[in-house]
A protein has these predicted regions:
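Short beta-strand element of the alpha/beta-hydrolase
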Residues: 51-61
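Hydrolase active-site cap/lid region
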Residues: 150-171
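The serine-hydrolase catalytic nucleophile loop
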Residues: 64-75
C-alpha cells in the first residue's frame, strides 16, 4: 500500500514539483475511503490561483498508470493550452501503480468510485471552473469515465473517450 508519510521514492511524495516545458507538474494524493490515490496536477506556465481554469481529469486504461498517460504528453499539451489537468492511478488499476489496493481487487465499479472521489477533491479547488470540468478516459478508463459522467451529469461538461472499452459492460 502507498504510504503518504514516507516513501523510498521522493518523486511520489505530496507536493513534489517538476517543471516541464510550458507547465508545472505537482504530486497531489487524494483518498477514496481508506484508499490512497496517487495523482498529479499539471498547471499552465502562467497559472494564477486567483483565476479559474477549465480542468481535465485523465483516466488510464487497465494495467496502465498515470505515467503511461504522461508519456503520451496529453497532460503536458493540455496544460500548455491553458487547462489544469489531473492524472491519477486507479486503486488496483495496475500491477505497478502508486495507489493502494491489489490488482485482483479492482473492478470497473471500484474504479468508478475512485474517479468520483477524485472529482470531489478536484472540485474543491478554488481555481476550478465548475462549468468546465472534462473527463478524458482511455480504454477501460473511457468506460469508467462514461459511467461516472452518467451518474454525475451536472458535474461533467464533456468527455473525451479514447478507444473506450465499452465491450466490458457486455461481458
Amino acid at each position: 500500500d502507498a504510504d503518504l508519510e514516507e516513501s523510498d521514492n521522493p518523486e511520489i511524495e505530496e507536493g513534489y514539483t517538476t517543471e516541464l516545458e510550458g507547465c508545472t507538474k505537482v504530486v497531489s494524493w487524494c483518498k477514496n475511503g481508506d484508499n490512497n490515490i496517487y495523482g498529479q496536477f499539471y498547471y499552465p506556465e502562467d497559472f494564477d490561483e486567483t483565476k479559474t481554469y477549465p480542468v481535465i481529469i485523465m483516466s488510464h486504461g487497465i494495467g496502465s498508470t498515470s505515467q503511461m498517460v504522461e508519456r503520451a504528453k496529453w497532460p503536458e499539451k493540455a496544460a500548455q493550452d491553458g487547462y489544469v489537468v489531473y492524472t491519477f492511478d486507479f486503486c488496483g488499476g495496475s500491477l505497478n501503480g502508486n495507489s493502494d489496493v491489489d490488482f485482483m481487487d479492482m473492478t470497473v465499479m471500484t474504479e468508478k468510485e475512485d474517479l468520483s472521489a477524485v472529482m470531489d477533491v478536484v472540485k474543491t479547488k478554488d481555481y476550478v471552473d465548475q462549468d468546465h470540468l472534462f473527463l478524458l478516459g482511455q480504454s477501460q478508463g473511457g468506460l469508467v469515465s462514461a459511467l461516472t459522467a452518467a451518474d454525475r451529469k451536472d458535474d461533467v461538461a464533456a468527455m473525451i473517450l479514447i478507444y473506450p472499452a465499452f465491450c466490458i459492460a457486455d461481458n
